[in-house]
Amino acid sequence: MTASWSPTTRETDALQRHAHVQRLPRVDAVWPWLADRHGLIAAVDAPHAAHPERFNFGELAERIATAAAAFRRHGVNDGDVVALFAENSPRWLVADQGLMRAGAADAVRGASAPVEELRYILSDCRATALVVQNADVWRRLALPPEQRAQLRFVLQLEGEPAEGAMGWEAFLASGAGLDPVGPAGGRDAVATVLYTSGTTGQPKGVPLTHANLLHQMSSLACVAYPEPGAPVLSVLPIWHAYERSASYFFLSCGCTQTYTTIKQLKKDLPRVRPIAMATVPRLWEAVQAGFEDVLKTFPPSRQRLLRAALANSAAQRKAVRTARNLLLEPVSAAGRLRACGSAALRWPLHALASTLIWPKLRRQLSGGQLAYPISGGGAIAPHIDAFFEAVGIELLVGYGLTETSPVVSCRRPWRNIRGSSGLPMPQTEFRIVDPDNGQPLGFRQRGRVMVRGPQVMAGYLGKPEASAKVLDAAGWFDTGDLGMLLPDGSVALTGRAKDTIVLSSGENIEPGPLEEALVASPLIEQVMLVGQDERQLGGLIVPRAEAIVAWAAEAGVSVAQDLGGQPGDPALLRLLMRECNRLLKQRSGSRGDERLAGVVLVDPFSIENGLLTQTLKQRRDRITSRDQQLIDGLYGR
């Protein structure tokens, strides 16, 4: 069974409005077009950068052309690969697009990545030159003389240039007044080399062509179509495929993109009031947790009022979904009829809250006009989805991988099936196959997710054997994810094949959905399940300390206020394990082997300690390594 894109009238109209992108020969060709039509509209704004900058589309196009001429002057040729190790900023964009305009590709990574990873990328992509964010990155690399000699130049985007590096302003001055030589390659030329997140093993280089990226810039119009000048926020790492494609798309619409950071996001949301933003689930979890923290400071009577309004709105929206058959599981005619009645009964209070309460809350949470909150990089926990839907923020969950540029599916505003990752993008096909024999499966049958489309890479950089493992002769890419197709063509993910926990009984457990159920608890900040080759599952839990201490006290268990760095009081752990198993038992389709034999409290997983990727995915192997002694104790080893 294969599911492919079936265009609606809305999507056809949106693609037609965005047809200029489909006609572009290369990604970098979009800037003269934008300068000609939207030259005076603000394009990029970086208020928090080391050098705050703001350019309109005319100025941005001019700087990109100047950078391209400068790169050519310093020896960059068609087909070269230049490493770019820096974070989000207008200068990153100018360097990136200047390299493309000069005919080169960039191999990108964040400035804060481990030095060993940066050195590996520099060597693996055979970079002929290097662009770094600042002197610190260049010094940390500490390249040996023979590797330095292979680089034609080192360009520094910020600060006083270090020894052996060139400063940004001097670099641009070297290209001023020169006409950049146009690139020889077209759509099939490599535009960039991205590296997989490396949650396990060495990262692999993924060469993406201009055609791959242009497909994203065009097809995302099926999901969102903001008007020229509309404000958007960029908060995710620009060197990640998801933010990269989203940024290109929003800018190709003529939007004004403000660069923010996780630290500044709370202030920038009400200030910028974005129409659209590319996000990850962890961001929405943090926003919802912040709401809960603020709610606890209110008088009890006001807390009860808000919680009652929230529960009613969540129930009303769920009833509407059920009536419209927008659920993962099919709903009978009788069930849809009952849902219509429930939605009608709850409508008056929901309408009142939607007039008096939720607009104020939306302004505080997202700025008040976020029409396209696109979430990718992982599944959204059901309780997070339900909360934001209740207050009037419809999360548009998408799915993709670095190897697919990345978006292959996304929920549409008019077809938003909660629990799914949406419908295929234009010209994209899905197939679900049996994990054991590779035979195609039917609707609602779970198996490995295969995808084919114009956004899929041709293969890993210099790794033909690894490429052959994931790409077949017909162009089908094995995502490594597990999922199923719904009758309307939507794809729903159920887990990651390599994350599957196989118990000693031979039963396969997908930890993702179980972990989503557990983090719905106000007691749990983060969780990772373990149990490979064991009789039962176990849980590594990062607690919400204040909430868990108060909860334990109500149950008659006295624990220390500071829970950090300790496995936990035995009485507390037994209590917490029972609570976890209660939550797991409540899951739809819950199985008896999806229960925990024990839990331990662990320190947080973060980007800083290397246990989360830059897109906030757990590095399960590293977490296991850090907490191996606690896991051994959990199983009595």
Segments predicted by a language model, with ranges:
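AMP-dependent adenylate-forming
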Residues: T12, A29-F55, V600-I607
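Conserved pre-ATP/AMP-binding loop-to-beta segment of ANL
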Residues: G39, Q156, A173-Y195, Q202, ...
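Conserved AMP-binding/adenylate-forming core of the ANL superfamily
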Residues: A42-Q97, P114-R119, G167-A170, H210-A211
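Conserved AMP-binding A3 loop
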Residues: R54-G58, A191-M217, R620
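Structural core segment of the AMP-binding/adenylate-forming
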Residues: R73-H74, R101-A170
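AMP-binding/adenylate-forming catalytic core of the ANL superfamily
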Residues: A113, L130, G453, A458-G459, ...
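Conserved AMP-binding/adenylation subdomain of ANL enzymes
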Residues: L214-L233, I238-A334, C340-T355, P359
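Conserved ATP-binding/catalytic segment of the ANL
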Residues: P424, T428, N437-R444, R448-L503
